Amino acid sequence: MNKYPIDDIKAPAYLFIGGEVLFMKENIKVQKVSTRLDVPTSHNIKAGDILTDQAITIKGSPVAFSNSNVLFDALAFVKGQRLPKIDNCYIVARVASGKWVKWSFAPAIHDTIGSITFGANLPMGEHGWTVYPNPLKPNEPLVKVEETTAPVVSNLEDAGKFMLRVLGKYGDELAFDTDGANIDISISTEDAQNDRLIKYGKTLSDITVSAKFKPRNISLDDWELLTGITSAEEIGTFTGVNTCEDLVLQGAKKGDFMFTLKSARCKDPSDTFSPKDALMDELTFDAMGDNFGDNKLVIGTVAEDFQFADESAQ
């Protein structure tokens, strides 16, 4: 490959995960991270160090994708499950006119799912993948580099679908509008290590899902019912993980994305009595999941155009 002044290289790139293509906002960040243990002599002088673990992280905020499943696959995993390694992960980048390079990674683990924001210019937060060495083949590189040709990119779906009008439903009775919403997703993991303490993967500890929004086009009575702020609750009462209503946030048109927070409960609701501010503050709902505390967020598509009950009656 020809040499170029490193400062002059600008490298627009595509990320392929499991063969599916992702186009990231602004950049794709690849970082090699290592942990080393100092080895001192008897005089407490550092003689060197030992490499104890190493990994490569890949991070970026998707703006377009060929298949949304590659972004939300981890939502279906259950606690205690080993996060699967995904083959066929690589970056194809243009480093000069007509010059493309391909970085092929060892199998990667999807361990970070970014937030989903409706009604903003940044619809999706940062996703992350981690590449670990294979303990059975410790000499294999984590990434291989080669020259290649321009990638063949299929039709991409714009993440702007998440920027559409967001409607909400809670249970079977309550339907309301919003002025935008945000869904935060956090994955907690534990390192998987062999008997020589070499990290080779991750085990899922838990997934937490919460949604924030301000309801609109809702009556005061329905808002009080939605938040539970005026409901009487007895101290010491047990509430099972799958006993609350489901919260649905969805687009208004058929085919739009629909996000279902399983057994969602309003967390610390508040209101503001003021001559200047709206009574209805932003609400936060936490998903508790199914009977085992799993499957907290289910993603689908809207089957038909949404209509409020009073609209359909007109």
Per-range role (PLM):
Residues 32, 95, 133, 185-187, ...:
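Residues on the solvent-exposed faces and adjacent turns
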Residues 28, 71-76, 102-108, 140-147, ...:
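Short, tandemly repeated low-complexity microdomains enriched for cysteine and small residues
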Residues 72-102, 229-257:
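Short, acidic/charged, Gly/Pro-enriched secondary-structure junctions
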Residues 1, 61-82, 138-150, 216-237:
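Charged, amphipathic alpha-helical segments
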Residues 130-154, 279-314:
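Protruding loop/beta-arch "assembly-hinge" segments enriched in small, turn-prone residues
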Residues 98, 254-256, 266-268, 290-292:
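Short Gly/Pro-enriched loop/turn and capping motifs at secondary-structure junctions
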Residues 106, 132, 252, 262-264, ...:
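Short, loop-centered acidic/histidine patches that primarily coordinate divalent metals
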Residues 1-70, 101-126, 152-223, 263-281:
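Solvent-exposed edge beta-strands and adjacent loop segments
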